[in-house]
Design a protein with these regions (language model features):
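Short, hinge-like loop/turn segments at secondary-structure boundaries
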Residues: 97-98, 119-122, 216-218, 252-254, ...
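Active-site proximal loops enriched in glycine and acidic residues that flank catalytic Cys/His/Asp
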Residues: 202, 238, 266-268, 304-308, ...
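Terminal RNA-binding accessory module
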Residues: 348-450
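Conserved beta-strand core positions
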Residues: 7, 44-45, 151, 198, ...
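Conserved, mostly hydrophobic/aromatic
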Residues: 183, 200, 236, 264, ...
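Short glycine-enriched, charge-decorated loop/helix-capping segments at active-site entrances
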Residues: 51-52, 172, 212-215, 275-281, ...
Length: 450
């Protein structure tokens, strides 16, 4: 037990990767390591990488190179690289960055302690990769890094969808659900640590259970999680539109703790492009599904993501997207300019779109969404909502919080004017008094609802 050793963990990329980082922190904590946020005093640096799109790849490479320098200038004795980039570019990283001492794939992060022991014991260039389709064992509790009052619960790993632009199946393997009992136990541990909001994540949450139980079990999982004392909000992200069932809609509607919020990445609205993307929905099906959600759960907040400038996208296709966004009026929308990823079918399509056009189209969609978001925000004025307090605004009698419509890190906030003392994680009733494009302003209507 190297008790005196200090570890810095750098987590890049998505919330699913963050869960893996928190799992590794839990294992390292169990084995007696200390932690630091200061790269200058770290004895060991672990970088959990991302390479989903080119920008993420660059960030991962730059972070590795930056931290590699600390082996010369700082106290760093061991540099370990994990995650998606390690999975994809194992050979290149070992060949081109000699400072890297250990490397682990996406399905072996539970080996972090063993790899560290081997590295600290003098073994060079330790490499740990198992079958991509195994599920790491995570009986040890996680160390929460999100501030304590919300946590991501990763309910499945991998993906079987094989969209033509996406490398996730080759980085994360085939779809495999985490057994329900294990998830319930993990959620109970999180609640005991003070977590009040669970955010369910996976590459695709709506298929949960199909591989283990022979049918979709997300509704059943929601019912089980809703019974855990101390959990007040359950939020679902990464839903595939074609997998949303009547049972799921009913579970969202009937379980009080499940937020009336769904993140449903649709990626496009032109049938021609959806087909080229390998997506399994048509515009008509998307329209029907969104209409059904709005009818069944009138106050639902819908978030989606779209890709602008996919290979072969014409101006006509782009106009279809704009018309669809205008008609559907999503509460939340993120748009990415298409990024060609090597080894994906779409990267080999002949009709790639120039960078400038991709960015112009992305900006055009976002400008339209900004108008929609402002109208949506303004329509909230006068409503009274439960707000989870995130923290205090420095030097002001005000707090920052989130409503059920806001997932952390990706959506907006509500600024709550109050001289009273609230703690992060408190739920407060707030009357909305004003709005900007993506954020709301309000005042305390009735304190401490939960």
């Amino acid at each position: 037990r190297e008790i005196s050793m200090k570890i810095l963990c750098v987590s890049l990329g998505c919330d699913k990767n963050l869960v893996d980082t928190e799992m590794m922190l839990g294992l390292l904590n169990r084995d007696g390591y200390n932690f630091t946020d200061d790269e200058q005093e770290a004895d060991i640096i672990v970088i959990n990488t991302c390479c989903f799109i080119n920008d993420a790849k660059e960030e991962s490479v730059n972070t590795i190179l930056e931290m590699a320098e600390l082996k010369k200038t700082g106290t760093c004795k061991a540099l370990i690289v994990t995650g998606c980039m390690a999975q994809r570019y194992q050979q290149e990283i070992l060949e081109e960055i000699p400072e890297v001492d250990g490397i682990l794939g996406t399905s072996t992060y539970d080996e972090i302690s063993n790899v560290l022991k081997r590295v600290l014991g003098g073994e060079e260039r330790v490499s740990c990769f198992h079958d991509l389709n195994c599920l790491p064992q995570t009986e040890t509790g996680r160390m929460i890094t999100t501030g304590g009052h919300f946590a991501f619960l990763k309910i499945a790993e991998g993906c079987d969808k094989h969209c033509t632009y996406c490398i996730i199946p080759s980085l994360r393997g085939s779809y495999r659900s985490v057994p329900m009992e294990r998830l319930v136990k993990e959620a109970e541990q999180l609640a005991e640590q003070g977590v009040r909001e669970l955010i369910l994540v996976a590459q695709e949450t709506t298929l949960y259970g199909v591989d283990l139980y022979g049918k979709k079990m997300l509704p059943e999982l929601l019912h089980r999680l809703a019974q855990i004392p101390g959990i007040y909000w359950i939020r679902i992200q990464y839903c595939y539109p074609e997998e949303i069932t009547d049972e799921l809609i009913e579970a969202i509607r009937s379980e009080e703790k499940v937020c009336h919020y769904l993140d449903i990445p649709i990626q496009h609205a032109s049938d021609r492009i959806l087909k080229r993307m390998g997506r399994r929905t048509s515009q008509a099906q998307l329209r029907e599904m969104i209409g059904r959600l709005r009818r069944e759960i009138p106050d639902i907040a819908l978030r989606t993501t779209m890709i602008a400038g996919f290979p072969g996208e014409t101006e006509e296709d782009h106009q279809e997207v704009l018309a669809f966004v205008d008609e559907m009026e999503f509460e939340r929308l993120g748009v990415f300019a298409y990024s060609a990823e090597e080894d994906t079918p779409a990267a080999g399509f002949a009709d790639q779109i120039p960078e400038e056009i991709k960015e112009d189209r992305r900006d055009e969609i976002m400008e339209l969404q900004q108008e929609i978001a402002f109208e949506k925000s303004e329509s909230m004025v006068g409503r009274v909502l439960d707000v989870m307090i995130e923290g205090k605004v420095a030097d002001e009698a005000a707090y920052v919080g989130r409503t059920y419509m806001d997932a952390p890190n990706v959506d907006g906030y509500i600024f709550v004017n109050s001289g009273e003392l609230f703690m992060s994680g408190d739920f407060v009733r707030v009357k909305v008094t004003g709005a900007s494009e993506y954020d709301l302003i309000g005042e305390v209507y009735d304190e401490f609802t939960k």
